[in-house]
């Protein structure tokens, strides 16, 4: 369930972008300003609004630590701000002077990328705040960008419909015609998945465009292969051009906004529509999940930003880490997993500190009272609370549940199948779940979103026997 809990009405013109840090929400607008709000009560911070651009602000994004914010504008500049007091730290002028449409920090805050209307893309060195490298897309304006989770690669989208994968040396690794009428946005989930061929280095990417579609891709990043894009499926829930899309922090949900004035939340694994939100009165231009996935922000040409609270029963980073059938011990968590765990435990304010110190799962479970005092400078109250939670994690590591093989789980319910059947799309599902799917007048595949050629369900006796044998081995 998604509940509208707050509406921000401070902008005097179209809202173009919104972005979360662990403690703040930033919004930007055609009115030339950026506004910053506290996540505690969604009140505007004392130094907000930020005024430095002379024309419309198209995009804003926080650095991973949340200590800085970048914004870009028609005025050809990308500005870096200090989020502690609103000070302007640097003004990065696009070398060509072209209007800047998009900006993104790399996951390690090493680089900031800015993309412009003339197709130029610039990598800036964040530490020196100086120009590093630049390139150009073949045709059209550069309107979308997303970094790989490792930060060594990034993807750009252009108004001519191309997706281009680059490395941090600005070498073009591959190019894919994705949307006939132009790309509008793209995002990469930070959680690895399997595409059936590669065991690691594979992630999901979403792109959306003027063709009314969202396309989901497998994207492989490897130093020896470069970048590789592989089409997965198309989501066709919108009836008009899709202007924005974003994955939740845990990768389990995908949200999109459209010219049809609707916001749609999809379940990433199946492509099922979880919610359709239709409170905006004009085009939905931007959407973003908070790091812990409990909040969703949507912005529109109606000059408002809606804040939604998602039901705890929805996929959430904290729940996923501890309860997913493919559970991993805490010491194998990535830095993003640690951030999600912090949010789930009520320590969202510590995400920036832990990221700044590169604390992954192994570092987390080995934290001591001394390291919290001397290295992280943590207060007594926080120390005792966080140490208690870490000790609970260590206890859970003593006995980790056995992972259920993914092929034994129903793609719809993500539960162990008891009576598997093969549908016309070639995938196996729990019989009851697939029958419910069909009875709700759904005629598309839960896995591919393509039309089902027939509604015949064939018992998968081979899979049923394999599940039975596996269950027997677990009881020994």
Curated annotation (Swiss-Prot):
Gene3D superfamilies: Transcription Factor, Ets-1, YVTN repeat-like/Quinoprotein amine dehydrogenase, Zinc/RING finger domain, C3HC4 (zinc finger)
WD repeat placement: 10-47, 52-91, 95-134, 137-176, 178-227, 237-276, 279-318
PROSITE patterns reported for this sequence: SAM_DOMAIN, U_BOX, WD_REPEATS_1, WD_REPEATS_2, WD_REPEATS_REGION
U-box domain segment(s): 403-476
Annotated SUPFAM superfamilies: Quinoprotein alcohol dehydrogenase-like, RING/U-box, SAM/Pointed domain
Gene Ontology terms: biological process: protein ubiquitination
Stored Pfam families: SAM_2, U-box, WD40
The keyword Repeat appears for this protein: yes
CDD domains, A to Z: RING-Ubox_WDSUB1-like (cd16655), SAM_WDSUB1 (cd09505), WD40 (cd00200)
InterPro entries (alphabetical): G-protein_beta_WD-40_rep, Quinoprotein_ADH-like_sf, SAM, SAM/pointed_sf, Ubox_domain, WD-SAM-U-box, WD40/YVTN_repeat-like_dom_sf, WD40_repeat_CS
Domain SAM per the UniProt entry, residue ranges: 333-396
MF annotations from Gene Ontology: ubiquitin-protein transferase activity
Keywords: Repeat, WD repeat
Name of the protein: WD repeat, SAM and U-box domain-containing protein 1
Gene that this polypeptide is encoded by: WDSUB1
